[in-house]
Amino acid sequence: MKRLHWKCYIPRLCQALNEDDPDRRVEFCEWYLAKCADDVKFAHKIVWSDEATFKLNGVIVWCGISALGIIGPFFFNETVNGESYLNLFQEFIGPQITEMFGEDSDIYFQQNGAPPHYHRDLRAPLDAVFPNTWIGRRGPIEYPARSPDLTPMDFFLWGYLKDNVYANKPRTIDALKLEIERQCRDIPNDMFRDVCESLGARYQRCLDNNGHQFEHSQT
């Protein structure tokens, strides 16, 4: 961890798992590790995504990250719903990912199971941009519910960003947005690469713990 020069942000409170969640987590980790065994660059082919709320008056931010860097931030002016997320995907997320990786790249796109990500009108655009390669609720690849410890958005990006954004004490919404944008720009790309390349070891720890939460046992 010291060699990589980045800090792992471990949630203080574990999200309780349902009875069948460990099995779903095992399935996902096994799928990921099998893909990595077949393709040594597979860790570089996933875009991880999520929203987070930054507090002043509650700024909702979407970002995506991959081993190549960050996409976003994009700001929502109100609570995220299916329509606003669909618009963001069509106008920004899909085009930005295509710009980053190229038209013909075999790229995977991950999103969690939040209700806006499950909007009935979103599936067709997802299938069009990422045919059989999007990861999420009822997608071609299921992302396990209640698993923030398996996505670098939660175990890395949001904690890192909030620490750095709040350290500069922005006092207005506009100042907060500018600081979020600046901090996103300032994250070096090799940090994203290192975080994404660390996922294999993290997922192996999950398997070693039979799909149960494992961060409390990290050394």
Residue ranges and their predicted role:
Residues 1-219:
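Surface/interface recognition patches
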